[in-house]
């Protein structure tokens, strides 16, 4: 049931590229989600982007830091950043990502 939404009730079908950084102490971290041609930007969609909602059986994680990418005046993508300010937020995020990856047949690789 792990899903991502940009507008409540409208599940995003495009699978993002996710980049993670974490402090040396493990207390803070950042997740950057890059969506190429997400469903929310389709011409027929009239919903407003109100944030990025990561929803699973534990609840939801919310970030309001969502930016659009435009090429020649047309929307081409979205970038959302979620900042984790504690080890507990990091662990919660990782649990969500494990569920999301399992449901979408995704893998994880360290760079």
Swiss-Prot record:
The gene is psb28. Belongs to the Psb28 family. The lineage of its organism: Bacteria, Bacillati, Cyanobacteriota, Cyanophyceae, Nostocales. It comes from the Bacteria. One of its GO terms (biological process) is photosynthesis. This is Photosystem II reaction center Psb28 protein. InterPro entries: Psb28_c1_sf, PSII_Psb28_class-1. NCBIfam families: PS_II_psb28 (TIGR03047). GO terms for cellular component: photosystem II oxygen evolving complex; plasma membrane-derived thylakoid membrane. PANTHER family: PHOTOSYSTEM II REACTION CENTER PSB28 PROTEIN, CHLOROPLASTIC (PTHR34963:SF2), PTHR34963. It is found in: Cellular thylakoid membrane. Part of the photosystem II complex. Keywords: Membrane, Photosynthesis, Photosystem II, Thylakoid. It is a peripheral membrane protein.
